[in-house]
Amino acid sequence: MSALSPSPSLVVDRESWELAGHLLVDPPRGEAAEICPSLSHHLQQLLVLNRQAKDHPADPFPLAALLQLGLPLMDRRWTAQERESVRQAADQWRQELVGDTVSYVVNRNLNPSNHCVLRCGFCAYRRSEGEEGAFRLHRSELREKAAEAQALGATEVCLQAGLDPYATKNGSQLDHAVALLVDLKEAAPRLHVHGFSPQELLFLSQQDNLPLREVVQSLRQAGLGSVPGTAAEVLCTRVRQLICPEKLSARAWVAVIRQVHQAGLPTTSTLMAGHVETPREQLAHLCTLSALQRQAWLEGNTGFTEFILLPFVGASAPAPLRARVGRDQPDPEAMLLLTAQARLLLGPWIRHHQSSWVKLTLPVAAEALDWGCDDLGGTLMEEHISTMAGAAGGTHQSVVALEGAARGKHRPVRQRTTLYGAPAASC
């Protein structure tokens, strides 16, 4: 982005910017929990806290209690018995909150361009103009892909691209984005368009020097149905300075998401884990998401539709980061444990939890159904970002494969829409 681009605090509403500073949770300090017989007591207390929050959603957000109970849940030396206790507690809470049915969505990923002005330390997807492997799809190609997806029974198209400085119409980034949405809705009117991450929204706003509120409303009017909660990575300044110093700050991410929720657009929520972050930073991130969701509910908005744990894939990451992390693929045991921890810490605030077969592989994603997840994500039809990073899960899954994964866990399964409704019969 240009050095002359306005600061996020200048394009985001002042109220959202100030509130973001209060909603953003700092990692807790204090002594780390050692192996002790009290974990089961902490788990029971956490379940009680979650049930109380579910029954009394207007009560003050229990941040202090969440941090107090969450610290021994996150930062400890684990035994196999303790891991199993956490799994059982997460599975129990999942069943209480959303039942046993596993869901999935028939969708298609669309990546219009991998040109990007940022150079995040973990990204193998981005390219500069003229660089080998750079691509930019023509609008006609995107229309064709959307129409094909609708014809194949998809209910959703997911848009995600780099921050392409040349993606303009009449010199405007926003006009180009609006034209893209109009194209997609004309080509496939039944498809829900899920796109434009907080980073992309901020980029549009800064490049066109427009208030974020105007950008979001224009996109919504053009057909945008929901926003992916990507670019969150870990909502901690220390981590972001190490892996993505050019990206929007943690406070900016929170402020943008809050303003998107205010505009009536639901979003997903994410955590990219398994790299340089600590358990306490994971805990603070999850508490921030819960606080944001409670804020959305208080304001009468849907807020987050789901939480998606995104395990770090480093096979194609720069050598320094790969060396620091010490592995190229996710650690399944660590990610399953974090899946359960997230289910417990996100309490009643974020009901649906999705496992990522792209990053974990479908067998491990199915295993996550026993650790608190209730959703297997989408069919995708194609995928480039994680695959270019070296993910081993593949680029698409069939409905048969996703339903088979759920039934293999002896769970009922259903197709859903983006917002977890039932698809129309015509789709």
How should each PLM-predicted stretch be described?
Residues 108-110, 163-165, 197-202, 231-233, ...:
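Active-site-proximal loop/turn and secondary-structure-junction residues that shape catalytic pockets
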Residues 1-81, 150, 286-290, 294-427:
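Auxiliary Fe-S-binding modules of radical SAM enzymes
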Residues 67, 107-108, 130, 160-175, ...:
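Glycine-rich, proline-tolerant flexible connector loops at the mouths of alpha/beta enzymes
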Residues 102-110, 157, 193-197, 227-229, ...:
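Hydrophobic faces of well-ordered beta-strands that scaffold small-molecule active sites
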Residues 154-257, 261-268, 275, 295, ...:
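Conserved SAM/AdoMet-binding glycine-rich loop
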Residues 86-127, 134-160, 227:
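N-terminal pre-triad scaffold of radical SAM enzymes
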Residues 146, 177-185, 216, 254-257, ...:
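Generic structural signal for well-ordered alpha-helices
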Residues 90, 120, 159, 227-230, ...:
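Conserved, mostly hydrophobic/aromatic
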